[in-house]
């Protein structure tokens, strides 16, 4: 059983950098990019000011979800080396401030999206925030090793939101992009979990390597990569994108599959020597940036 740990007492007033850290800026970058690509890939364009507003709302909504995640998980963050210096466990901010910030940011983002763009985009944004905070953070993360599988839906919403903001509809292409991110999430996070497993185990988070072991995790990474690759090339196969996307996505997905296979067949047990796992984790981030970039490039250049 994991030892108990609590955030240290707040010693100083939080500054703007602490509030920014609550939004998880690194995660925010990918979320905003996929939302922006969903907006640009839509068949009809919108005024640049409205487009900027839509992307801003996606960023604020994702930031709100990140803040509420850190509010709820302050005790876990205090036990994990990679999160111990976050504002709450480090004592630079009190939990009530984080809660108020997250709730306020979330409400503002949804209201602004609804008033400036349309109700559908605002509704999907609201669902994405609630899904990440309630379903993933509060309900799943501490209870099941499948937490990241189901919770992965939260990170898959931005492309849907961007498309809906531009069109007021949800159509096949953004749904396929949603499926792609949903299926990408387990290999991405399980690759990370393999080489920081001790952090999760110390905090008592039932990530797959800690519960089912390394071998089962490696197999699951390969099993999820196959349908992810199918989802990645499906837009081209269905005639929703052109050759620019299709060829690029096929090559990138083949490389992803190769890296996943290297992880799957690896017998390395020492986290410090897990090069294949680190390669897959690093490439998986680049992969998603490039895939979504290809969606936009295909529309602009075709």
Swiss-Prot record:
<feature type="transmembrane region" description="Helical">
    <location>
        <begin position="176"/>
        <end position="196"/>
    </location>
</feature>
<keyword id="KW-0350">Heme biosynthesis</keyword>
<dbReference type="InterPro" id="IPR044878">
    <property type="entry name" value="UbiA_sf"/>
</dbReference>
<feature type="transmembrane region" description="Helical">
    <location>
        <begin position="119"/>
        <end position="139"/>
    </location>
</feature>
<dbReference type="GO" id="GO:0048034">
    <property type="term" value="P:heme O biosynthetic process"/>
</dbReference>
<keyword id="KW-0808">Transferase</keyword>
<feature type="transmembrane region" description="Helical">
    <location>
        <begin position="240"/>
        <end position="260"/>
    </location>
</feature>
<dbReference type="InterPro" id="IPR030470">
    <property type="entry name" value="UbiA_prenylTrfase_CS"/>
</dbReference>
<keyword id="KW-1133">Transmembrane helix</keyword>
<feature type="transmembrane region" description="Helical">
    <location>
        <begin position="148"/>
        <end position="168"/>
    </location>
</feature>
<keyword id="KW-0812">Transmembrane</keyword>
<comment type="function">
    <text>Converts heme B (protoheme IX) to heme O by substitution of the vinyl group on carbon 2 of heme B porphyrin ring with a hydroxyethyl farnesyl side group.</text>
</comment>
<keyword id="KW-0472">Membrane</keyword>
<dbReference type="GO" id="GO:0005886">
    <property type="term" value="C:plasma membrane"/>
</dbReference>
<feature type="transmembrane region" description="Helical">
    <location>
        <begin position="48"/>
        <end position="68"/>
    </location>
</feature>
<dbReference type="InterPro" id="IPR006369">
    <property type="entry name" value="Protohaem_IX_farnesylTrfase"/>
</dbReference>
<dbReference type="Pfam" id="PF01040">
    <property type="entry name" value="UbiA"/>
</dbReference>
<feature type="transmembrane region" description="Helical">
    <location>
        <begin position="219"/>
        <end position="239"/>
    </location>
</feature>
<keyword id="KW-1003">Cell membrane</keyword>
<feature type="transmembrane region" description="Helical">
    <location>
        <begin position="27"/>
        <end position="47"/>
    </location>
</feature>
<comment type="similarity">
    <text>Belongs to the UbiA prenyltransferase family. Protoheme IX farnesyltransferase subfamily.</text>
</comment>
<keyword id="KW-0997">Cell inner membrane</keyword>
<dbReference type="GO" id="GO:0008495">
    <property type="term" value="F:protoheme IX farnesyltransferase activity"/>
</dbReference>
<protein>
    <recommendedName>
        <fullName>Protoheme IX farnesyltransferase</fullName>
        <ecNumber>2.5.1.141</ecNumber>
    </recommendedName>
</protein>
<feature type="transmembrane region" description="Helical">
    <location>
        <begin position="97"/>
        <end position="117"/>
    </location>
</feature>
<comment type="pathway">
    <text>Porphyrin-containing compound metabolism; heme O biosynthesis; heme O from protoheme: step 1/1.</text>
</comment>
<dbReference type="InterPro" id="IPR000537">
    <property type="entry name" value="UbiA_prenyltransferase"/>
</dbReference>
<feature type="transmembrane region" description="Helical">
    <location>
        <begin position="280"/>
        <end position="300"/>
    </location>
</feature>
């Amino acid at each position: 059983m994991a030892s108990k740990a609590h955030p240290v007492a707040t010693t100083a007033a939080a500054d703007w950098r602490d509030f920014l850290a609550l939004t998880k800026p690194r995660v925010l970058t990918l979320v905003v990019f996929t939302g922006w690509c969903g907006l640009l890939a839509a068949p009809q364009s919108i005024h640049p000011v409205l487009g900027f507003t839509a992307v801003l709302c996606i960023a604020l909504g994702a930031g709100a979800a990140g803040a509420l995640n850190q509010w709820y998980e302050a005790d876990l963050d205090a036990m994990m080396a990679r999160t111990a210096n976050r504002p709450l466990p480090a004592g630079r901010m009190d939990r009530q401030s984080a809660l108020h910030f997250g709730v306020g940011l979330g409400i503002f983002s949804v209201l602004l999206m609804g008033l400036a763009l349309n109700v559908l985009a605002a509704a999907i944004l609201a669902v994405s925030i609630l899904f990440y905070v309630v379903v993933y953070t509060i309900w799943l993360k501490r209870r099941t090793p499948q937490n990241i599988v189901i919770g992965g839906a939260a990170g898959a919403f931005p492309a849907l939101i961007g498309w809906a903001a531009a069109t007021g509809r949800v159509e096949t292409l953004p749904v396929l992009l949603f499926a792609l991110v949903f299926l990408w999430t387990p290999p991405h996070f399980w690759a990370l979990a393999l080489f920081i497993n001790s952090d999760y185990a110390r905090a008592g988070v039932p990530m797959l390597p800690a519960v089912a072991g390394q071998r089962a995790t490696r197999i699951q990474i390969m099993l999820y990569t196959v349908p992810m690759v199918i989802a990645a090339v499906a837009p081209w196969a269905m005639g929703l994108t052109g050759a620019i996307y299709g060829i690029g996505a096929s090559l990138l997905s083949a490389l992803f599959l190769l890296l996943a296979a290297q992880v799957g067949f690896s017998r390395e047990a020492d986290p410090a020597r897990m090069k294949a796992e680190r390669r897959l984790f690093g490439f998986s981030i680049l992969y998603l940036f490039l895939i979504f970039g290809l969606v936009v490039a295909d529309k602009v250049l075709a």
